[in-house]
From Swiss-Prot:
Belongs to the BamA family. It is found in: Cell outer membrane. Part of the outer membrane protein assembly complex, which is involved in assembly and insertion of beta-barrel proteins into the outer membrane. It comes from Haemophilus influenzae (strain ATCC 51907 / DSM 11121 / KW20 / Rd). Residues 1-19 form the signal peptide. GO terms for cellular component: Bam protein complex. This is Outer membrane protein assembly factor BamA. The lineage of its organism: Bacteria, Pseudomonadati, Pseudomonadota, Gammaproteobacteria, Pasteurellales. Keywords: Cell outer membrane, Membrane, Repeat, Signal, Transmembrane, Transmembrane beta strand. HAMAP family: OM_assembly_BamA.
Length: 795
């Protein structure tokens, strides 16, 4: 006769059917095999040969059931054998997600892992259904009310299961109508203008898609409008969002209670001011008394008070604005109640997220010191300086309190590093110049030290160049930088369609020291050496003027030059790559020094500014201008290979690289004494250049706000001019018939211009740059290159 001992868990309680104790000569586990069977045996409180009681059986069932790995657990006696029978839950062997595009697959997988649905976990179907429901609710929150999320479980042999999350995101519901109620003073059209979401209209491509998160932002924009226009008691009392039966259209009603419109009568500061009353009181002057109340003005003063206190160590100060309404006169007074709190000392500066950059490198950019009073201005300056390095996508800072201390904090900078090393490969195609290739290997944060190391090269049909560079920005503790270059160039310009004919071999090196003046200004000085060998050059007019001034004899030119370089730099950009605010400017020069064969100098000026048009810096105006001037001295002319040209990305998009400038005039007999009558499209260049560019940086379509700082789309207009300031005297040696066929190369007004669209992406594989430009002002024989791109890979 079979005696049964059954224990089960029901609603958290144990029910046991009693039987007489017995000695289990053997223990059998039914329902599973392999590792899981062994795990069950190891967890049992009894072993074969031991006495088994009803309490033992109850404990066995309870412990196995609460483990969450079994749908059913039973135990019974068969003769002198204890039998444990289980129905095991499936083990997840694979997880797949299909049909999603709005929510990234990686984000969904991270949430699945966090909720117990990674490979190797026990499958709990109820939790899987709850997860699918939460994902569907998220889609509804972004206006996709018809989205479906179906969890599909495929049962496999050996108690395994595959999970497929099948998603159909569907389209967002459209905002069909928008109605305001209760707005007696402010028109509905004015309130609607404050919103990004707009009712369905034929010309609306994106703005009519309803999204819950954006709707909440729009409601806040309406509140802000009222509060910044005197309606200090205005409230949104009710919102009604109604879906049609098909869940494709949304009708929204917003009820407001405007209240009275107030003027600001007075303002004062009271409370614990940390002994800084004299510094805080003047901040009230920013408020416009006896004018319409604006909450944003009050917020600005609150922030200014916190910032001023923060500069003195009061890093946890609070400011609460208390209004006193006079409804009869429609005025209000504001009392700013300040609590400076305790003065804080910085115990440590800590860094998070810098897996490549060394802590010591980041500390070089800090202005807040450990063991000193907390200074919010210096802490923020550290963030700005880290941003300017260009090593990071994002930089955030916070204050962490110290356990057991009420006046010590740690300042923590959390960074997200970007790929600062790159292998770039560029291609350009021009109507005249054909295909050219450029390649470079660069690491802006070498071994996490902040040093920049680069190898750049160019190879095309008419030459090769290589440049090795190194810059150590922290050469001394005072911030002096040290940089240097070694370069080699070998060109046969006779094969170029845009450059005047000659062969040139150049090599040299230079070293530069940079000295900081303050947070935004620095200057530099440097020394360099350059060797040039020019051969196989056709007799050309401008080149001949240089040869005569140098008194060279024969067909070859060899020069050794030593130069002194100097300059000033200004930088207030908010970050090192893709800046959105600030100005960067420089003035520089280079002049040959005694011991040189040549005698010449070159001067340059560059400025670029970024001006955000919105709070989020998604719309930005950028303006850039540069100028250069060069000339010889001591009765010697500027070398013809030191002239300026324009064209290409960086100077004038839409035109081939180096294709803009005065053209060469060859002798009728290239290596004889013929007269200079042969006008060419080859570019000899000029001794003066100006370039200008204006860009409107716009949000990149179909890219989330979070990713906007890794891509950049812009509409631009470029312009450039290259001319010869000595043309008036230089042309005197030319035949009049030749002059009639030549433009005035001395006119700076011979401007080329182009307009187009540019796109840049700091992709995971490296920087990608594309531009398409159409010339809007060009001259005969200009080499047009409308499409240009550069593709790189990172390491």
């Amino acid at each position: 006769m079979k005696k049964l001992l059954i224990a089960s868990l029901l609603f958290g309680t144990t029910t046991t059917v009693f039987a007489a104790p017995f000695v289990a000569k053997d223990i059998r586990v039914d329902g599973v095999q392999g590792d899981l069977e062994q795990q069950i045996r190891a967890s049992l409180p009894v072993r074969a040969g031991q006495r088994v009681t009803d309490n033992d059986v109850a404990n066995i069932v309870r412990s196995l059931f609460v483990s969450g790995r079994f749908d059913d657990v039973k135990a019974h006696q068969e003769g002198d054998v204890l039998v444990v029978s289980v129905v095991a839950k499936s083990i997840i062997s694979d997880v797949k997600i299909k049909g999603n595009s709005i929510i990234p697959t990686e984000a969904l997988k991270q949430n699945l892992d966090a909720n117990g649905f990674k490979v190797g976990d026990v499958l709990i179907r109820e939790k899987l259904n709850e997860f699918a429901k939460s994902v569907k609710e998220h889609y509804a929150s972004v206006g996709r009310y018809n989205a479906t999320v179906e969890p599909i479980v495929n049962t496999l042999p050996n108690n395994r299961a595959e999970i497929l999350i099948q998603i159909n995101e569907d389209d967002k519901a459209k905002l069909a109508s928008l109605t305001f109620k209760g707005n007696e003073s402010v028109s509905s059209s004015t309130l609607q203008e404050q919103m990004e979401l707009q009712p369905d209209s034929w010309w609306k491509l994106w703005g009519n898609k309803f999204e819950g998160a954006q709707f909440e932002k729009d409601l806040q924009s309406i509140r802000d409008y009222y509060l910044n226009n005197g309606y200090a008691k205005a409230q949104i009392t009710k919102t009604d969002v109604q879906l049609n039966d098909e869940k494709t259209k949304v009708n929204v009603t917003i009820d407001v209670n405007e209240g009275l419109q107030y003027d600001l009568r007075s303002a004062r500061i009271i409370g614990n001011l940390g002994g800084m009353s004299a510094e805080l009181e003047p901040l009230l002057s920013a408020l416009h008394l006896n004018d319409t109340f604006r909450r944003s003005d009050i917020a600005d003063v609150e922030n200014a008070i916190k910032a001023k206190l923060g500069e003195r160590g009061y890093g946890s100060a609070t400011v609460n604005s208390v209004p006193d309404f006079d409804d009869a006169n429609k005025t209000l007074a504001i009392t700013l109640v300040v609590d400076a709190g305790r003065r804080l000392t910085v115990r440590q500066l800590r860094f998070e997220g810098n897996t490549v950059s060394a802590d010591s490198t980041l500390r070089q950019e800090m202005r807040q010191q450990e063991g000193t009073w907390y200074n919010s201005q210096l802490v923020e300056l550290g963030k700005i300086r880290l941003d300017r390095t260009g090593f990071f996508e994002t930089v955030e800072n916070r204050i962490d309190p110290i356990n057991g201390s009420n006046d010590e904090v740690d300042v923590v900078y959390k960074v997200k590093e970007r790929n600062t090393g790159s292998i770039n490969f560029g291609i350009g195609y021009g109507t005249e110049s054909g295909i050219s290739y450029q390649a470079s290997v660069k690491q802006d944060n070498f071994l996490g030290t902040g040093a920049a190391v680069s190898i750049a090269g160019t190879k095309n049909d008419y030459g090769t160049s290589v440049n090795l560079g190194y810059t150590e920005p922290y050469f001394t503790k005072d911030g002096v930088s040290l940089g240097g270059n070694v370069f080699f160039e070998n060109y046969d310009n006779s094969k170029s369609d845009t450059s005047s004919n000659y062969k040139r071999t150049t090599y040299g090196s230079n070293v530069t020291l940079g000295f900081p003046v303050n947070e935004n200004n620095s200057y530099y000085v440097g020394l360099g050496h350059t060797y040039n060998k020019i051969s196989n050059f056709a007799l050309e007019y401008n080149r001949n003027l240089y040869i005569q001034s140098m008194k060279f004899k024969g067909n070859g030119i060899k020069t050794n030059d030593f130069d002194f370089s100097f300059g000033w730099n200004y930088n207030s950009l908010n970050r090192g790559y893709f800046p959105t605010k600030g100005v960067k400017a420089s003035l520089g020069g280079r002049v040959t020094i005694p011991g040189s064969d040549n005698k010449y100098y070159k001067l340059s000026a560059d400025v670029q500014g970024f001006y955000p048009l919105d709070r989020d810096h998604l719309w930005v105006v950028s303006a850039k201008a540069s100028a250069g001037y060069a000339n010889g001295f001591g009765n010697k002319r500027l070398p013809f290979y030191q002239t300026y040209t324009a064209g290409g990305i960086g100077s004038l998009r839409g035109f081939a690289y180096g294709s803009i400038g005065p053209n060469a005039i060859y002798a009728e007999h290239g290596n004889g004494n013929g007269t200079f009558k042969k006008i060419s499209s080859d570019v000899i260049g000029g001794n003066a250049i100006t370039t200008a560019s204006a860009e409107l940086i716009v949000p990149t379509p179909f890219v989330s706000d979070k990713s906007q700082n890794t891509v950049r789309t812009s509409l631009f207009v470029d312009a450039a001019s290259v001319w010869n300031t000595k043309w008036k005297s230089d042309k005197s040696g030319l035949d009049n018939n030749v002059l009639k066929s030549l433009p005035d190369y001395g006119k700076s007004s011979r401007i080329r211009a182009s307009t187009g669209v540019g796109f840049q992406w700091q992709s995971p594989i490296g920087p990608l740059v594309f531009s398409y430009a159409k010339p809007i002002k060009k001259y005969e024989n200009d080499d047009v290159e409308q499409f240009q791109f550069s593709i790189g890979g990172s390491f």
